[in-house]
C-alpha cells in the first residue's frame, strides 16, 4: 500500500473488503499516514452475536471487531465503516438477533449490506438444525434495513455546512435538473449542478460546499 501510494498522478486509493483482524492499532496508524488513502473501510461482520459467529465458523469475536473499528476511529477523523450482516443463520434465536441489533447500534456504520441466509445444498449450515423460517428472516432483515437507513443518514449529515472534496464521475438528471455526481474520500455521494459549471467534467476533483440532501443518498 505504501508503494502504491508513491505512484505519481494517483490521487485516491480505496481498499476493498477487509478481514477485521487485519486492522490492528499499528496497521491503522500506518494507513492514516497515507494522505491518498480513502478512509472507507469495509469490514465484514456477518453477525453481532458471538454465539452465531461461532456457528458460522468466523475466526473473530464482536469484541475483536469493535477494537478494529475503534483503532480506525482513533486514527481517522471521520472514517466510513461499512459491513455485511446475515440474518436468519441456522439457530439464530430472537435473543441472538437482539444481540446483533444492539451491536450494530453500538458500532454505528455508514452502510450495512443486509442479507437473508439462504440454504445451499452440501454445506455444513444446510445440515444444521433449527433452520429459521422465511417469514422471520424477512422481519429481521426489515428491522436492520431500517437501522441501516437511519445510521447512513446520520453519517452523511456530518458534511452539511462543510466543504467536501468530490471526485466527479457521472452526469445524472434528478428532478429535471442535470448534475455532476461523484464521491467524497469516504464514499459519500455529492452532486453539483451542471448548469453554469462548464469547467466540470468526469474524473475531476472539486471542492464544494455542502448544504443538505438532494435525495436520501446524495448530498448537494
Question: Where are the regions a protein language model picked out?
Answer:
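Conserved SAM/AdoMet-binding glycine-rich loop
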Residues: 1-94, 105
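Conserved, mostly hydrophobic/aromatic
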Residues: 15, 43, 84, 104, ...
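Flexible glycine/acidic-rich beta-alpha junction loops that bind and position SAM and/or redox cofactors
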Residues: 22-26, 45-56, 87-94, 111-135, ...
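Short beta-alpha junctions and helix-cap segments that line functional grooves
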Residues: 27-28, 100, 194
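Short, hinge-like loop/turn segments at secondary-structure boundaries
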Residues: 31-33, 100, 129-132
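Extended hydrophobic-aromatic, low-complexity segments
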Residues: 39-41, 53-54, 74-83, 95-97, ...
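Proteins enriched for Cys/Gly/acidic motifs involved in redox and nucleic-acid/cofactor modification
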Residues: 41, 63-74, 97-98, 102-106, ...
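Terminal RNA-binding accessory module
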Residues: 127-220
Amino acid at each position: 500500500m505504501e508503494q502504491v501510494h508513491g505512484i505519481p498522478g494517483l490521487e485516491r486509493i480505496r481498499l476493498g473488503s477487509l478481514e477485521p483482524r487485519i486492522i490492528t492499532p499499528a496497521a491503522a496508524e500506518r494507513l492514516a499516514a497515507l494522505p491518498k488513502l480513502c478512509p472507507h473501510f469495509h469490514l465484514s461482520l456477518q453477525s453481532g452475536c458471538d454465539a452465531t459467529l461461532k456457528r458460522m465458523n468466523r475466526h473473530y469475536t464482536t469484541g475483536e471487531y469493535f477494537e478494529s473499528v475503534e483503532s480506525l476511529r482513533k486514527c481517522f477523523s471521520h472514517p466510513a465503516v461499512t459491513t455485511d450482516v446475515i440474518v436468519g443463520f441456522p439457530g439464530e434465536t430472537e435473543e441472538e438477533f437482539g444481540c446483533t441489533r444492539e451491536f450494530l447500534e453500538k458500532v454505528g456504520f455508514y452502510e450495512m449490506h443486509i442479507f437473508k441466509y439462504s440454504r445451499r445444498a452440501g454445506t455444513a449450515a444446510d445440515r444444521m438444525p433449527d433452520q429459521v423460517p422465511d417469514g422471520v428472516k424477512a422481519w429481521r432483515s426489515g428491522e436492520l434495513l431500517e437501522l441501516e437507513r437511519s445510521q447512513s443518514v446520520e453519517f452523511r449529515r456530518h458534511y452539511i455546512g462543510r466543504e467536501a472534496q468530490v471526485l466527479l464521475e457521472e452526469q445524472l438528471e434528478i428532478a429535471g435538473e442535470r448534475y455532476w455526481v461523484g464521491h467524497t474520500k469516504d464514499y459519500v455521494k455529492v452532486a453539483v449542478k451542471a448548469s453554469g459549471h462548464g469547467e466540470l467534467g468526469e474524473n475531476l476533483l472539486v471542492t464544494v460546499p455542502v448544504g443538505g440532501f438532494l435525495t436520501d443518498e446524495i448530498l448537494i
